[in-house]
């Protein structure tokens, strides 16, 4: 009589079971996917989703009132919404638009500043003295040197 071997996987169903059914053996992927996503950077201490939509909308609209730094604040505060593309679609709409607006504003401001500082008097000619702001007090007679 032959004894059955206990180390044969076909005979022992408990040993045949895969302890990790996830085909991706990366343990970090399960941690990241199971973590709750919050709309703001301060996590559970932050705003509710309804209040977040209101704040994102306000930051976006006030950014058009010549306060484009609010677009940066909007992108920073709602960074988790930018990172996770499928989370919070109502908030994401305002945050992505704020990111685009801030990028365009930064590009235009940088181009203007570089053109003015590099080009200077050679680029603008006699108009340069009227454009610069360091001699406004002298031009208006406010410095007392006239």
From Swiss-Prot:
Q: What are its GO biological-process terms?
A: Notch signaling pathway
Transmembrane annotation, as ranges: 62-82, 99-119
Locate the compositionally biased regions of type Low complexity. Answer: 9-19
Q: How does it sit in the membrane?
A: Multi-pass membrane protein
Residue ranges that the UniProt entry lists as topological domain Lumenal: 1-61, 120-146
Q: Which GO terms describe its cellular component?
A: Golgi-associated vesicle; membrane
Superkingdom of the organism of origin = Eukaryota
Q: Which residues form the signal peptide?
A: none
Look up keyword NAD and say if it applies: no
Q: Which residues lie on this side of the membrane: Cytoplasmic?
A: 83-98
Statement: the UniProt record of this protein carries the keyword Transmembrane helix? yes
- Report keywords, A-Z: Membrane, Notch signaling pathway, Transmembrane, Transmembrane helix
Query: What Pfam families does the record tag this protein with?
Result: PEN-2
Q: Where in the cell is it found?
A: Membrane
Q: What is its main location?
A: membrane
Q: Where is this region: Disordered?
A: 1-26
Its quaternary organisation is: Probable component of the gamma-secretase complex, a complex composed of a presenilin homodimer, nicastrin, APH1 and PEN2.
What's this protein's family per the entry? Answer: Belongs to the PEN-2 family.
What's the stated role of this polypeptide? Answer: Probable subunit of the gamma-secretase complex, an endoprotease complex that catalyzes the intramembrane cleavage of integral membrane proteins such as Notch receptors.
What is this protein's record name? Probable gamma-secretase subunit PEN-2
Q: Which organism is it from?
A: Arabidopsis thaliana
Lineage of the species this protein comes from = Eukaryota, Viridiplantae, Streptophyta, Embryophyta, Tracheophyta
